[in-house]
Amino acid sequence: MRPSLDSYAHLAGGKVRDLYTIDDEHLLLVASDRISAYDHVLSTPIPDKGRVLTAMSVFFFGVLGGNNHLAGEPDDSRIPEEVLGRALVVRKLNMVPVECVARGYLTGSGLIDYNETGAVCGVALPEGLVEASQLPDPIFTPARKAELGEHDENISFEAVVEKVGQDLAVKLRDDTLDVYGRASNFAADRGIILADTKLEFGLDAQNNLILADEVLTPDSSRYWPADGYEAGKVQPSFDKQFVRNWLTGPESGWDRASDTPPPPLPAEIVEATRARYIEAYERISGLSFADWVG
Protein backbone atom coordinates (compact mmCIF):
# COMPACT_ATOMS: atom_id res chain seq x y z
CA MET A 1 0.00 0.00 0.00
CA ARG A 2 1.37 3.39 -0.98
CA PRO A 3 1.82 6.16 1.59
CA SER A 4 -0.40 9.23 1.44
CA LEU A 5 1.09 12.60 0.58
CA ASP A 6 0.03 13.81 4.04
CA SER A 7 2.50 11.37 5.57
CA TYR A 8 5.42 13.44 4.26
CA ALA A 9 6.40 16.85 5.62
CA HIS A 10 6.18 19.65 3.05
CA LEU A 11 9.68 21.10 2.80
CA ALA A 12 9.43 23.79 0.15
CA GLY A 13 7.33 24.99 -2.75
CA GLY A 14 8.28 26.78 -5.95
CA LYS A 15 6.48 28.12 -8.99
CA VAL A 16 5.78 24.64 -10.31
CA ARG A 17 7.25 22.04 -7.93
CA ASP A 18 6.82 21.02 -4.31
CA LEU A 19 9.36 19.18 -2.16
CA TYR A 20 8.51 16.75 0.62
CA THR A 21 10.83 15.01 3.06
CA ILE A 22 10.85 11.20 2.84
CA ASP A 23 13.80 10.56 5.16
CA ASP A 24 17.23 12.01 5.99
CA GLU A 25 18.61 11.22 2.54
CA HIS A 26 15.62 11.37 0.19
CA LEU A 27 13.03 13.86 -0.99
CA LEU A 28 9.80 13.59 -2.97
CA LEU A 29 9.85 16.04 -5.89
CA VAL A 30 6.32 16.72 -7.16
CA ALA A 31 5.64 18.56 -10.41
CA SER A 32 2.26 20.31 -10.42
CA ASP A 33 0.19 21.45 -13.40
CA ARG A 34 0.92 25.07 -12.50
CA ILE A 35 2.50 27.17 -15.23
CA SER A 36 4.55 30.31 -14.73
CA ALA A 37 5.37 33.13 -17.11
CA TYR A 38 7.13 36.44 -16.61
CA ASP A 39 7.69 35.61 -12.92
CA HIS A 40 3.97 35.06 -12.29
CA VAL A 41 2.30 31.75 -11.49
CA LEU A 42 -0.80 31.77 -13.66
CA SER A 43 -4.20 31.03 -12.17
CA THR A 44 -5.01 28.46 -14.87
CA PRO A 45 -3.29 25.06 -14.69
CA ILE A 46 -2.35 22.99 -17.75
CA PRO A 47 -3.75 19.44 -17.37
CA ASP A 48 -1.07 16.71 -17.40
CA LYS A 49 1.75 19.25 -17.50
CA GLY A 50 3.39 17.91 -14.34
CA ARG A 51 3.30 14.37 -15.71
CA VAL A 52 4.91 15.50 -18.98
CA LEU A 53 7.69 17.33 -17.13
CA THR A 54 8.36 14.26 -15.01
CA ALA A 55 8.31 11.89 -17.99
CA MET A 56 10.65 14.13 -19.97
CA SER A 57 13.10 14.45 -17.08
CA VAL A 58 13.19 10.69 -16.51
CA PHE A 59 13.74 10.10 -20.22
CA PHE A 60 16.65 12.52 -20.49
CA PHE A 61 18.27 11.43 -17.23
CA GLY A 62 18.40 8.01 -18.89
CA VAL A 63 19.78 9.36 -22.17
CA LEU A 64 22.47 11.45 -20.47
CA GLY A 65 23.62 8.88 -17.93
CA GLY A 66 26.19 9.98 -15.36
CA ASN A 67 25.45 11.42 -11.93
CA ASN A 68 21.90 12.61 -11.32
CA HIS A 69 19.60 12.94 -8.34
CA LEU A 70 17.15 10.12 -9.14
CA ALA A 71 16.85 7.61 -6.30
CA GLY A 72 13.96 5.47 -7.50
CA GLU A 73 11.87 4.40 -10.47
CA PRO A 74 8.81 6.43 -11.59
CA ASP A 75 6.55 3.86 -9.88
CA ASP A 76 8.64 3.65 -6.68
CA SER A 77 6.55 2.37 -3.75
CA ARG A 78 7.36 5.52 -1.75
CA ILE A 79 5.42 7.68 -4.21
CA PRO A 80 1.82 8.36 -3.09
CA GLU A 81 -0.96 7.28 -5.45
CA GLU A 82 -2.31 10.82 -5.81
CA VAL A 83 0.97 12.09 -7.34
CA LEU A 84 2.03 8.95 -9.23
CA GLY A 85 3.45 9.96 -12.61
CA ARG A 86 4.24 13.51 -11.51
CA ALA A 87 6.58 12.75 -8.60
CA LEU A 88 10.07 11.32 -8.21
CA VAL A 89 12.14 10.08 -5.29
CA VAL A 90 15.40 12.03 -5.40
CA ARG A 91 18.56 12.35 -3.36
CA LYS A 92 18.86 15.21 -0.90
CA LEU A 93 21.63 17.52 -2.15
CA ASN A 94 23.21 20.84 -1.31
CA MET A 95 21.91 22.81 -4.29
CA VAL A 96 24.26 25.20 -6.06
CA PRO A 97 22.64 28.69 -6.06
CA VAL A 98 23.15 29.28 -9.79
CA GLU A 99 20.80 28.76 -12.73
CA CYS A 100 23.01 27.15 -15.38
CA VAL A 101 21.80 28.20 -18.83
CA ALA A 102 23.24 27.11 -22.17
CA ARG A 103 22.19 28.92 -25.34
CA GLY A 104 22.74 27.84 -28.91
CA TYR A 105 20.34 30.41 -30.38
CA LEU A 106 19.59 34.03 -29.57
CA THR A 107 16.14 34.72 -28.13
CA GLY A 108 14.38 35.80 -24.93
CA SER A 109 16.41 37.62 -22.29
CA GLY A 110 19.58 36.76 -24.23
CA LEU A 111 18.36 38.76 -27.22
CA ILE A 112 17.46 41.68 -24.96
CA ASP A 113 20.97 41.66 -23.44
CA TYR A 114 22.55 41.40 -26.88
CA ASN A 115 20.56 44.31 -28.30
CA GLU A 116 21.60 46.47 -25.35
CA THR A 117 25.25 45.46 -24.99
CA GLY A 118 26.34 43.27 -27.90
CA ALA A 119 26.91 40.48 -25.40
CA VAL A 120 25.01 37.98 -23.26
CA CYS A 121 26.15 37.60 -19.65
CA GLY A 122 29.44 39.22 -20.61
CA VAL A 123 30.02 36.89 -23.58
CA ALA A 124 30.66 39.09 -26.63
CA LEU A 125 28.84 38.03 -29.79
CA PRO A 126 29.20 39.00 -33.48
CA GLU A 127 27.34 41.99 -34.86
CA GLY A 128 24.18 41.58 -36.89
CA LEU A 129 22.47 38.79 -34.96
CA VAL A 130 18.68 38.81 -34.85
CA GLU A 131 15.82 36.94 -33.19
CA ALA A 132 16.51 33.18 -33.34
CA SER A 133 20.00 33.54 -34.85
CA GLN A 134 22.15 30.47 -34.30
CA LEU A 135 25.24 31.38 -32.28
CA PRO A 136 28.72 30.51 -33.60
CA ASP A 137 29.10 28.19 -30.61
CA PRO A 138 26.82 27.46 -27.63
CA ILE A 139 27.47 29.79 -24.69
CA PHE A 140 27.09 29.50 -20.91
CA THR A 141 24.85 32.29 -19.61
CA PRO A 142 24.24 31.78 -15.88
CA ALA A 143 21.59 33.49 -13.80
CA ARG A 144 21.07 34.19 -10.13
CA LYS A 145 18.02 32.24 -8.92
CA ALA A 146 15.35 34.65 -7.73
CA GLU A 147 12.84 34.35 -4.94
CA LEU A 148 9.23 33.61 -5.91
CA GLY A 149 7.82 36.68 -7.67
CA GLU A 150 11.24 38.17 -8.42
CA HIS A 151 13.17 38.14 -11.68
CA ASP A 152 16.04 35.73 -12.28
CA GLU A 153 19.06 37.93 -12.97
CA ASN A 154 21.54 37.11 -15.73
CA ILE A 155 25.08 37.20 -14.35
CA SER A 156 28.60 36.86 -15.75
CA PHE A 157 30.85 33.83 -15.41
CA GLU A 158 33.05 35.96 -13.16
CA ALA A 159 30.10 36.46 -10.81
CA VAL A 160 29.67 32.68 -10.64
CA VAL A 161 33.36 32.34 -9.74
CA GLU A 162 32.88 34.86 -6.92
CA LYS A 163 29.84 32.95 -5.68
CA VAL A 164 31.08 29.34 -5.79
CA GLY A 165 34.82 29.45 -6.54
CA GLN A 166 36.84 28.94 -9.71
CA ASP A 167 36.90 25.13 -9.80
CA LEU A 168 33.17 24.64 -9.26
CA ALA A 169 32.31 27.48 -11.67
CA VAL A 170 34.36 25.85 -14.43
CA LYS A 171 32.74 22.48 -13.71
CA LEU A 172 29.25 24.03 -13.86
CA ARG A 173 30.03 25.70 -17.18
CA ASP A 174 31.62 22.63 -18.74
CA ASP A 175 28.91 20.22 -17.57
CA THR A 176 26.13 22.57 -18.72
CA LEU A 177 27.60 22.95 -22.19
CA ASP A 178 28.22 19.20 -22.40
CA VAL A 179 24.59 18.40 -21.56
CA TYR A 180 23.35 21.02 -24.02
CA GLY A 181 25.59 19.74 -26.79
CA ARG A 182 24.50 16.13 -26.40
CA ALA A 183 20.82 16.99 -25.97
CA SER A 184 20.76 19.37 -28.94
CA ASN A 185 22.27 16.68 -31.17
CA PHE A 186 19.71 14.18 -29.86
CA ALA A 187 16.84 16.59 -30.57
CA ALA A 188 18.22 17.54 -34.00
CA ASP A 189 18.12 13.89 -35.05
CA ARG A 190 14.38 14.08 -34.37
CA GLY A 191 13.74 17.27 -36.31
CA ILE A 192 13.73 19.58 -33.29
CA ILE A 193 15.98 22.51 -32.39
CA LEU A 194 16.96 22.86 -28.74
CA ALA A 195 17.44 26.64 -28.64
CA ASP A 196 18.46 26.85 -24.99
CA THR A 197 18.05 25.08 -21.68
CA LYS A 198 18.36 25.73 -17.96
CA LEU A 199 19.95 23.19 -15.62
CA GLU A 200 20.42 23.00 -11.87
CA PHE A 201 23.09 21.10 -9.98
CA GLY A 202 23.69 20.04 -6.40
CA LEU A 203 26.56 18.65 -4.36
CA ASP A 204 26.36 15.33 -2.55
CA ALA A 205 28.05 14.50 0.76
CA GLN A 206 31.31 13.77 -1.10
CA ASN A 207 31.11 17.11 -2.98
CA ASN A 208 30.38 15.40 -6.29
CA LEU A 209 28.46 17.62 -8.71
CA ILE A 210 25.06 16.06 -9.43
CA LEU A 211 22.54 17.01 -12.13
CA ALA A 212 19.27 17.71 -10.31
CA ASP A 213 15.79 19.23 -10.51
CA GLU A 214 14.18 18.94 -13.96
CA VAL A 215 16.18 18.37 -17.12
CA LEU A 216 15.44 19.35 -20.72
CA THR A 217 11.70 19.77 -20.20
CA PRO A 218 9.43 22.18 -22.11
CA ASP A 219 9.48 24.36 -18.96
CA SER A 220 13.26 24.60 -18.71
CA SER A 221 14.05 24.61 -22.44
CA ARG A 222 13.01 26.17 -25.72
CA TYR A 223 12.17 23.59 -28.37
CA TRP A 224 11.50 24.65 -31.96
CA PRO A 225 10.52 22.55 -34.98
CA ALA A 226 13.53 22.46 -37.33
CA ASP A 227 11.21 22.36 -40.33
CA GLY A 228 10.55 25.98 -41.29
CA TYR A 229 13.22 27.46 -39.01
CA GLU A 230 14.14 30.97 -40.13
CA ALA A 231 16.23 33.48 -38.22
CA GLY A 232 14.73 36.94 -37.82
CA LYS A 233 11.30 35.88 -36.63
CA VAL A 234 9.72 34.34 -33.55
CA GLN A 235 9.72 30.57 -33.93
CA PRO A 236 6.75 28.28 -33.27
CA SER A 237 7.54 26.26 -30.18
CA PHE A 238 6.81 23.13 -28.18
CA ASP A 239 7.17 24.92 -24.86
CA LYS A 240 5.55 27.60 -22.73
CA GLN A 241 6.66 30.35 -25.12
CA PHE A 242 3.22 29.81 -26.65
CA VAL A 243 1.66 31.02 -23.38
CA ARG A 244 4.11 33.93 -23.13
CA ASN A 245 3.20 35.04 -26.64
CA TRP A 246 -0.53 34.99 -25.84
CA LEU A 247 -0.02 36.95 -22.62
CA THR A 248 1.91 39.72 -24.37
CA GLY A 249 -0.38 39.77 -27.42
CA PRO A 250 -3.45 41.97 -27.85
CA GLU A 251 -5.96 39.20 -27.08
CA SER A 252 -4.99 38.92 -23.41
CA GLY A 253 -5.41 42.61 -22.63
CA TRP A 254 -2.62 42.29 -20.06
CA ASP A 255 0.08 44.89 -19.56
CA ARG A 256 3.26 43.10 -18.53
CA ALA A 257 4.64 46.33 -17.05
CA SER A 258 1.68 46.72 -14.70
CA ASP A 259 1.36 45.36 -11.18
CA THR A 260 -1.71 43.34 -12.08
CA PRO A 261 -1.47 39.54 -12.33
CA PRO A 262 -1.94 37.89 -15.74
CA PRO A 263 -5.51 36.96 -16.72
CA PRO A 264 -6.80 33.38 -16.75
CA LEU A 265 -5.92 31.42 -19.88
CA PRO A 266 -8.75 30.67 -22.33
CA ALA A 267 -9.67 27.02 -22.80
CA GLU A 268 -8.21 26.90 -26.32
CA ILE A 269 -4.83 28.21 -25.09
CA VAL A 270 -4.84 25.64 -22.27
CA GLU A 271 -5.57 22.75 -24.63
CA ALA A 272 -3.07 23.93 -27.26
CA THR A 273 -0.37 24.27 -24.59
CA ARG A 274 -1.11 20.78 -23.24
CA ALA A 275 -0.90 19.39 -26.78
CA ARG A 276 2.45 21.10 -27.38
CA TYR A 277 3.96 19.68 -24.19
CA ILE A 278 2.80 16.16 -25.05
CA GLU A 279 4.03 16.50 -28.64
CA ALA A 280 7.46 17.59 -27.42
CA TYR A 281 7.71 14.49 -25.21
CA GLU A 282 6.49 12.09 -27.87
CA ARG A 283 8.56 13.49 -30.73
CA ILE A 284 11.78 13.60 -28.74
CA SER A 285 11.41 10.36 -26.79
CA GLY A 286 9.67 8.30 -29.45
CA LEU A 287 7.36 7.08 -26.67
CA SER A 288 3.61 7.43 -26.23
CA PHE A 289 2.56 9.67 -23.36
CA ALA A 290 -0.46 7.40 -22.89
CA ASP A 291 1.94 4.72 -21.62
CA TRP A 292 3.46 6.95 -18.92
CA VAL A 293 2.86 6.13 -15.25
CA GLY A 294 -0.17 7.60 -13.52
Swiss-Prot record:
Offer an example of a GO molecular function term for this protein.
Answer: ATP binding
- CDD domains membership: SAICAR_synt_Sc (cd01414)
- Reaction catalysed by this enzyme: 5-amino-1-(5-phospho-D-ribosyl)imidazole-4-carboxylate + L-aspartate + ATP = (2S)-2-[5-amino-1-(5-phospho-beta-D-ribosyl)imidazole-4-carboxamido]succinate + ADP + phosphate + 2 H(+)
Q: Which domain of life is it from?
A: Bacteria
Phosphoprotein as UniProt keyword: no
Q: In which pathway does it act?
A: Purine metabolism; IMP biosynthesis via de novo pathway; 5-amino-1-(5-phospho-D-ribosyl)imidazole-4-carboxamide from 5-amino-1-(5-phospho-D-ribosyl)imidazole-4-carboxylate: step 1/2
Q: Which family does it belong to?
A: Belongs to the SAICAR synthetase family.
Q: What is this protein called?
A: Phosphoribosylaminoimidazole-succinocarboxamide synthase
Q: Which gene encodes it?
A: purC
